[in-house]
Amino acid sequence: GAAEYGNKLNLTFDEMDSVITQGKELGIYLYMFTGGEPLVRKEDIIKLCKKHSDCAFLAYTNGTLVDEKLCEQMVEVGNFYLAISLEGFEAVNDLRRGNGVYGKVMHAMELLKQYGLIFGTSICYTSKNIETVTSDEFVDLMVEKGCRYAFYFHYMPVGNDAAVELLPTPEQREEIFHRIRKFRQTKAIFSMDFQNDAQFVGGCIAGGRRYLHINAKGDVEPCVFIHYSNANIHDCSLLDALKSPLFQAYHDNQPFNDNMLRPCPMLENPDKLGEMVKESKAVNTDYQSPETPEHLKEKAAPYAENWTPTAEKLWNEEKEKIEAKKNA
């Protein structure tokens, strides 16, 4: 899938339409919108859903713009799904997302459920909220509200102003590894952990292996969290972007680690990203506050080092389980 994104979501309808048209020729039928807030462009998104009825579209949203009209349009098109961002219960959520947002999210979920629509939640877990968002109470509430899936994202220390203290500890990450696996067996919701479930997709899927990201300016990036690029959709085709030096470097280096609990070239293998950026001469795409790969590595390296022993232990246990199943 490809994703389009930006603070002002300022790719035009025609530009997004062109990306999808080109994508379909390459076999891409899943498109995601992130933000900013993609639902400020809901009319354009619905138009894209109608025009490309053979594709599935998903928006990551704060949920505040969900109303009856949108629900009716979603029922009509049948190929648009939502992942509503939550950080926890009301007090924690509104601290990050603004007063009153939690109440609006609950209302949005009630509306979507009433219309029989498929939706879920998107949760960024940090050292501060990890206990809450993996509690039975929280997950049970999501099930009750009608969520069919929960996408758990590990906090990424991207950007010059990133707060490294929000990175989960090895103990916390080990705990969420076990809890989400338990939820998949016991809760009526499909839970995915984007950092701890790499074993099911053979490691990092970015850089065009199974996924890429296009920002608001049209820069084609390997991943929503990796702000480096050699290609822009205004200057080249999607296929050319997939052949760009940084994407080729991803292709040549994946998987970045044989340990599937250390999949990322930034977070768990921080040397890798710098090497690929240097080798591909990719430029930084964060125009407001460009960050060097060296600065990013400084933040990720201590985390990677601390996580490695736990990752090795857990991955060895997983491999034993896989072997046991094979031999059963």
Question: What positions do the PLM features span?
Answer:
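N-terminal pre-core extensions flanking Radical SAM catalytic domains
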Residues: 1-3, 24, 238
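Canonical Radical SAM [4Fe-4S] cluster-binding loop centered on the CxxxCxxC motif
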Residues: 1-13
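Radical SAM/AdoMet-radical enzyme domain recognition
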Residues: 13-34, 41-153
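Flexible mid-to-C-terminal extensions adjoining Fe-S/redox cofactors in radical SAM and related proteins
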Residues: 225-328
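A short, flexible beta-alpha/helix-coil linker loop
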Residues: 2-5, 89-91, 157-160
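Radical SAM enzyme [4Fe-4S]-AdoMet core and its adjacent flexible, acidic
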Residues: 55, 94-207, 216-217, 221, ...
